[in-house]
């Protein structure tokens, strides 16, 4: 078995059985490179939609499980479910969120390390099916009349591990097929899976809630289990696994430099037969830009996941235009935050490509998050129209940088020039960045569970402070990118060029 610093691959690549099936019905046999790219885009997209859909039931059923939520609940949806129906119900729900997200954060680092060494298709399938089983087991408590707090805690802990497998895998696979030049826009569109998953999960959970809260979990569970099987049958991990040949016209200057995992992976196979080196965990932290973006995402994801887990609950506790909304209506209304997130992710990717500045774009969105949150808290209750507009704007600025950092930025850093094209780092770097962010994601919701009992104003001040710190962490990178825009090539490019003759690449085994 590979150690923490081992660089051995633990698998032999094989063509997915579904690809064999498709090739039998094609006159020319093999699929084209672009067809494989389309397949990868769609499969990874729907896979992570399913992952996020399974996270939404928790936030949707909070008001149903807790009979005595924060504030004076006046809606029609009551009932409660022990042990969450007491005065400390919101705190217990926050602890369950903490258990899930803590294991998710730790598991992300482990999953990323394994993702560069295991068959990504099989590993991703395990994560999806395991997530489906855990999500269903949470809902089974409704029919089995289970009220033990530690049952829910154990299920969410296990679910956190299986969920952590997904992100490093899908980003690594996508990075294997798309070059750096177009990552911003492509991954900006692709990152819509986060918000779409939240929307779909919300609609499924709220639609089934009237039949009993257990169904809110079973629906998304069946979805991700089915899609996990589809992924196993059809997902091509990289061009070599399916013997795909890139058209000469598609190779651009960026790819000739060996920036992408695909090129370095294929070239290494040509020269050595089978390159088994993968970047080590500590070495990945040394890649320029990884640490600042990782800690930036800590605070960015804290804000995003607080909304993910608590927005429907907050809306149900707030009179909008003098009217108290039901749990179902609150859940459906909260999807507008995710609609804004879809637009924000696409805009962030587009602007970052046009400016060639990931940090500038992320920082700009993050700083605009602060007034957006302030306005939503102060004026969101005035009327339904104002609430919708401000919720959309808040979602745009909150999820825009989150989507950019976890996709295009992670893929760029995972194929950084300092690696000199001789190491596999995509899954590891992705895991470091999103794993660090997930620590913040674990802290935000549980803090909200306690702070909301005091005041929702305090919750929003906490979120605005987190956004400010997040933006400040990118200051150095923003300054470097501004200098590059004003004066030409960056200092980093000169350093990398000099390093090619003066020092060896990053030690991939550290």
Curated annotation (Swiss-Prot):
Where are the coiled-coil regions? Answer: none
Q: What is its main location?
A: membrane
GO CC annotation, single = membrane
**InterPro entries assigned:** MFS, MFS_dom, MFS_trans_sf, SLC37A1_2, Sugar_P_transporter
State the source organism's domain of life: Eukaryota
**Mind listing the UniProt keywords for this protein, alphabetically?**
Membrane, Sugar transport, Transmembrane, Transmembrane helix, Transport
Which GO BP terms sit in this record? phosphate ion homeostasis
Q: How does it sit in the membrane?
A: Multi-pass membrane protein
PROSITE patterns in UniProt: MFS
Q: Which Pfam families match?
A: MFS_1
Q: Where in the cell is it found?
A: Membrane
Indicate the transmembrane segments per the record.
31-51, 91-111, 123-143, 158-178, 185-205, 217-237, 279-299, 331-351, 355-375, 378-398, 436-456, 459-479
A Gene Ontology molecular-function term? glucose 6-phosphate:phosphate antiporter activity
The entry sums up its family as follows:
Belongs to the major facilitator superfamily. Organophosphate:Pi antiporter (OPA) (TC 2.A.1.4) family.
Q: What is this protein called?
A: Putative glycerol-3-phosphate transporter 3
What taxonomic classification does the UniProt entry list for its organism?
Answer: Eukaryota, Viridiplantae, Streptophyta, Embryophyta, Tracheophyta
